[in-house]
Structures are given as C-alpha cells and as structure tokens.
Amino acid sequence: MGIKHLFQVIQENAPDAVKSGDIKNHFGRKVAIDASMSIYSFLIAVRSEGQQLMSESGETTSHLMGMFYRTLRMVDNGIKPLYVFDGAPPKLKSGELAKRTARKAEATEAHEEAKETGTAEEIEKFSRRTVRVTREHNAECKKLLKLMGVPYIDAPTEAEAQCAVLARAGKVYAAASEDMDTLCFEAPILLRHLTFSEQRKEPIQEIHLNRVLEGLDMDRSQFIDMCILLGCDYLEPIPKVGPNTALKLIREHGSLEKVVEAIESDPKKKYVIPEDWPYQDARELFHHPDVRAADHPECDFKWEAPDIEALVDFLVKDKGFNEDRVRNGAARLQKNLKTAQQSRLEGFFKPVAKTDAEKASLKRKHDEKLQEQKKRKKEEAKAKKEAKAKPRGAA
C-alpha cells in the first residue's frame, strides 16, 4: 500500500521534486527494484481476457511473463536491474496484512458469485482483488532471474528499505517501487512506473527526497511523522485526517507527539486517535529498519551472461512460452547487458543547482495551474447544477 496520498502532497507542495521522463533517460544506470511489488503488478496487469496467463498444466505464468519481458525492456534501454525480495514482514505490519488477507477472502467470495451472476467487468474487478504473491511466485521469479543473468538479493524484512540502503551507498542510482514509503526509508531517489509495460505509455517518475524535504520545508523526522499521519502499512490513519490536514498539523506542531497532545486536548474532539495507535513503533521502523549494510557479503551482486538453453527449457518446455521469442529475448539480453556497461556523461559533470528565484518561479507557476484547475472544476460543477435545476422544455 505505501503512504496514502503522499504523491499528491508532493505534487502540490514540492513540484520541483518530481521529474517525469522516458525510460531511455536512465541508460547506463544501475537500479534496485522492489521485486515483490513488481511481481504483484505483473499478476494484476499481465492478463488475457481478464484472466491470469496459464500454462497447459494450469499453472499461473503472468508473473514470469511480466518479469521476463519487463526486465528485457529495461535492459534494452541500457538499465542494469537488481531485484530485491521481501523477507519476513515486521511484527507491526501483521495487523495490516491480516486486513489485506480478509479483504482478499471477501473478494474471492465476490469473484465466485460474479462468475455465476455478474458481468465480465465485475468478474475481472473481483479477480484482480484476489491476487497475492506466493512463495512459489517468488521462487520461480528468482529461478528465472538467475537464468537471465540478472542479480537479486533477499532483504531481511522490507525490500524498499534495503533498496534505499543500496541507493544511499551509491551501489545503485535509485530505488524503484510503486510504494511511496521507499522515501520514508531515505532512498535519495525513487523511480516509479519503471516496470510498467510500454503499452501503458506512462512516463518514468523520478522523485528526489532532498527536494521533497526542501519543498515541504521539513526535516526527515517531520516528513516521516507526516507520512504516518497520512496512513502507512504499519498503522491505520486517524479518521477524518486527510492529506491537507496531515501536512497542516505537522507544520503547526512540528512532531507527532505534539499533534497527538493537541488532538487529545481539543475540547471539540474534532479528531479521535484510534485506541491502539503505536506511532512511536512505526516511526522506529522507518528510522531504523532491519537491513543489511551495503558492504555486507549478501549485498554483493553482478550481472552475467544468460543461460540460453536453460532459459528455453524453463520457459518453453516447462511453462509453454514461445521458443522464438524466448531465444530472441535471451540474445538481446546477452548483447545489451554488455552495452549497459558504458559510462554516462553525467559522471563527469556536476549538475547545476536551481537558484532560489528559479525554485520560487516553478512553485508559483504550479500554484497558478492548480488554482486554474480548481476554478474550472468549480465552474463546471456550477454549470451542471444550473442545468439540472433548469425546467424541462425551457428555452
């Protein structure tokens, strides 16, 4: 899940922190990728007629299809991916995981009912909600990556936290995940949409943590406190506290301790803090996650030549993939992993920082654009209301 509405908060208050661009812009870069999040997205997105792809024996293959072709796309564009798999979840996350399991059980029941009485759209909707990544999915993806010559490592707990460690140490350029909590783990740069399909035509979003903190006028501790208020994987949010309120409360009070104190002493009782809300524990998990140091032996990785025949055996003979496509993909892997070794020019030039005036100008333009959008929406809503109120047959 990550952090609710965090991207919206960043877009509205720190627009200079987000850069959108083409995948080709990342040529020659090493990137640590949140494997579990990627596999989950493959299981949801890689489908045929609303159903997951299956082998002749009835085994799901969507995760393998996604992992093979999306990794191939990255390597074709000169990126050197390193996948990081989740370990055991922190104890504090068990409550959120239990809720997700319950929601999936409800979705499974609704899916079965939809198959009997529902439309094709309802069947697909509930089918997507039943998706979960299993140990078998992870094991098969690890096997595939090994045969492709693409490295992976196992994190002690949260993959995003381990990706952040590698990015801070300079072993990779960035951490890639759809989970915004990667920024809470102090990833200097977060890439989103990197493992999306080419057909979706979604630009790669590059989010810089230092610019986020600068734009929000917060230090990292305040940023983490705001993210906990927004709602994270470890705690449910405080009812009625939305993104604007969370930002306002941290800016006004400076820390969660003072926010909690202000809420509890408010005679109007505008907000009610949940009975079991151990925010200090959640904060500790963001500040001191269970990770391995970047120079730990288990964080060593290298890219190797693909084992083409073993890939064909696994994907074609075992999983029913098209042999010509697999061989063609393996040949591209072999060629392009070598090409990705070329240095980027940015290694020789220091980027020029924006002046305060340039930053203020960017912020002003963004604010003006937001105001214009709000004004247009207000006018459209007013026009709709007037159209409804107009009596039928009136000229």
Swiss-Prot record:
Its EC number is 3.1.-.-. GO terms for biological process: base-excision repair; DNA replication, removal of RNA primer. GO terms for molecular function: 5'-3' exonuclease activity; 5'-flap endonuclease activity; DNA binding; magnesium ion binding. Phosphorylated. Phosphorylation upon DNA damage induces relocalization to the nuclear plasma. Residues 356-395 are annotated as: Disordered. Its cofactor is Mg(2+). SUPFAM superfamilies: 5' to 3' exonuclease, C-terminal subdomain, PIN domain-like. It is found in: Nucleus, Nucleolus; Nucleus, Nucleoplasm; Mitochondrion. The keyword Manganese does not apply. Keywords: DNA damage, DNA repair, DNA replication, Endonuclease, Exonuclease, Hydrolase, Magnesium, Metal-binding, Mitochondrion, Nuclease, Nucleus, Phosphoprotein. Residues 1-104 are annotated as: N-domain. InterPro entries: 5-3_exonuclease_C_sf, Flap_endonuc, HhH2, PIN-like_dom_sf, XPG-I_dom, XPG/Rad2, XPG_CS, XPG_DNA_repair_N. GO terms for cellular component: mitochondrion; nucleolus; nucleoplasm. Residues 341-349 are annotated as: Interaction with PCNA. Residues 122-253 are annotated as: I-domain. Structure-specific nuclease with 5'-flap endonuclease and 5'-3' exonuclease activities involved in DNA replication and repair. During DNA replication, cleaves the 5'-overhanging flap structure that is generated by displacement synthesis when DNA polymerase encounters the 5'-end of a downstream Okazaki fragment. It enters the flap from the 5'-end and then tracks to cleave the flap base, leaving a nick for ligation. Also involved in the long patch base excision repair (LP-BER) pathway, by cleaving within the apurinic/apyrimidinic (AP) site-terminated flap. Belongs to the XPG/RAD2 endonuclease family. FEN1 subfamily. Interacts with PCNA. Three molecules of fen1 bind to one PCNA trimer with each molecule binding to one PCNA monomer. PCNA stimulates the nuclease activity without altering cleavage specificity. This is Flap endonuclease 1. It comes from Aspergillus clavatus (strain ATCC 1007 / CBS 513.65 / DSM 816 / NCTC 3887 / NRRL 1 / QM 1276 / 107). The gene is fen1.
